[in-house]
Design a protein with these regions (language model features):
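P-loop NTPase switch/communication element
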Residues: 39-58, 130-131
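Flexible beta-alpha connector loops of hexameric P-loop NTPases
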Residues: 142-151, 203
Length: 255
């Protein structure tokens, strides 16, 4: 089994469209959408969900109103403004509450509460889906609102896709990666055989292409480039070709 990762240094270059096109052309392939923060491969491939798995990651603080003495210590220590003081009409303190979206799970309030009224609870951060498309099995996921640890969810998506590919004897694992060069992209890069960078002939497209090429080179992954929307600026297209030539990277296609 060979793993091909399609990524771009920025969003909107057309990597998901290219991924879906490769899926239509490939035979004996498993598909994985690792852009878990904003997954959209399903919009093109219309998968039928066969199984769902919860993704639990990290913890968030929860206040036990029965134990809380409203001392306000946690309120003054929270650097993320996740703890709020609710007041009565006369201005007196009614209760302390924690905004679950703003909470970063840093545990400062948990460790400093004088009466132990704050507990850390595991949080459901997202969902993983195992689906079937007319082009083959597909693994994709959805991260919850304001949730983090998308790198861990990316790793889980890849793991499930690899298991399916090995169990069914598939030849290819085609991965639609996230944009940028952050943790989710690094998680996507792990163990792949080829990185296909989709870029566009714009100044931001060129700059971000170079950043993601540098990232792939750091991990020693073979890299190719595909230029999408190549005719919107031929001067920039030639600039991309020159950059790739200097780096010894093949431009394998234009659209």
């Amino acid at each position: 089994m060979k793993q091909i990762l399609i990524i771009s240094g920025k969003g909107g270059t057309g990597k998901t469209v290219l991924t879906s096109s490769l899926a239509a052309l490939a035979k004996a392939a498993v598909l994985a959408d690792c852009d878990v923060d904003a997954a959209d491969l399903h919009l093109l491939l219309h998968p039928v969900v066969k199984g769902t798995q919860e993704f639990w990651s990290g913890q968030k603080a929860v206040i036990d109103d029965g134990q809380c003495i409203n001392c306000g210590r946690c309120l003054s220590l929270c650097r993320f403004e996740a703890i709020k003081a609710l007041k009565n009409q006369d201005g007196s303190l009614k209760k302390i509450e924690i905004d679950p979206i703003a909470c970063e799970g840093c545990r400062v309030c948990y460790y400093t509460c004088p009466v132990g009224a704050i507990q850390m609870e595991d949080r459901l951060s997202g969902l993983l889906f195992i689906s079937e498309t007319k082009y083959g099995p597909m693994v994709h996921a959805k991260l919850g609102i304001a949730e983090e640890n998308s790198g861990k969810l990316v790793a889980l998506v890849k793991q499930k896709a690899q298991e399916i590919a090995q169990a069914e004897g598939k030849r290819w694992l085609i991965i639609d990666g996230p944009p940028g060069i952050g943790c989710p992209v690094i998680a996507s890069l792990s163990g792949v055989d080829l990185v296909l960078v989709v870029t566009e002939p714009t100044l931001s497209g060129i700059y971000d292409m170079e950043r993601v090429i540098d990232l792939a080179a750091h991990f020693g992954v073979l890299t190719k480039v595909f230029i999408n929307k190549c005719d919107i600026n031929w001067d920039n297209t030639r600039t991309i070709e020159e950059i790739c030539q200097k780096r010894g990277i093949e431009v394998i296609g234009y659209l």
